[in-house]
Design a protein with these regions (language model features):
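Short, Lys/Arg-enriched N-terminal segments with co-localized hydrophobic residues
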Residues: 1-18
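Sec-dependent signal peptide recognition
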Residues: 20-25
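Acidic, surface-exposed loops and disordered segments
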Residues: 35-228
Length: 228
């Protein structure tokens, strides 16, 4: 490759990477500021915050390859605070959250599940049942409230977007929750989660620093229809 061309290519790549970091950082600031329960929205003229949030949503990807780096508890608390500020029916907050960021505990749960379902471990690159993430958020719902699962979904989306704004990837995992629920060997770990009476594990969210950059998958725009 021509030396001058290589220089220009590297310079452009550097600019693009810096722009990406800037917008993710800006999105993180906007997202986390929005999680302040005492703050009211304010008009802004310097930056179009709506486009930044839109870009954050559109750039999000499900991540299934993670670095081993741990997420600090302070960072996790900021992300989860955004989660619990999602809208929910009648403000019942009909969910409970358990966070597992101990590698030893994740390995123990994985071993228990695999003991009852060995085929899970046959997956390529398998390390744990949470797509090899170093952290997992387990979300349970109130089985006595018929809208609780909707509330859990809204909670999860806030968690996912707040994490992405901080450069942390995620993946929603219904299968992991099902494996835990269906595994007799994993019952001690489910009991250890100590969900309240009438609460049941619904799904998990894997969290970690991404070790991949997947392309967006097609979405079906024709699923949207306006009624006149």
């Amino acid at each position: 490759m021509n030396t001058n061309y290589q220089y220009k290519f590297n310079h452009i790549s550097l600019i693009m990477n810096n722009m990406k970091k800037f917008f993710l950082g800006l999105a993180a600031a906007l997202m986390l500021t929005a999680c302040n329960e005492n703050r009211q929205p304010e008009a802004t003229t310097s930056v179009d915050s709506s486009s930044v949030v839109t870009d954050l949503m559109m750039s999000r990807r499900s991540i299934r390859a993670y670095k081993d780096s741990a997420i600090s508890r302070d960072t996790l608390n900021e992300i989860l605070k955004c989660g619990i500020h999602a809208p929910n029916g009648q403000n019942l907050q009909s969910y409970e959250i358990r966070v597992i960021d101990s590698p030893a505990l994740i390995d123990s749960i994985t071993q228990a599940v695999v003991k009852d379902n060995p085929k899970i471990a046959e997956r390529k690159g398998f390390k744990n049942i949470f797509v090899n993430a170093p952290c997992v958020v387990c979300i349970a719902y109130d089985t006595t409230y018929d809208m609780a699962q909707i509330d859990c979904g809204l909670l999860g989306e806030n968690i996912i977007l707040a994490a992405w704004a901080k450069g942390i990837g995620s993946c929603c995992l219904g299968s992991s929750a099902r494996w835990i629920l269906d595994s007799p060997s994993a019952k001690p770990y489910l009991d250890r989660m100590a969900f309240s009476k009438n609460y049941k594990l619904l799904y998990c969210i894997a969290l970690g620093y991404p070790d991949e950059s997947p392309e967006a998958k097609p979405r079906h725009q024709d699923m949207i229809k306006f009624m006149d």
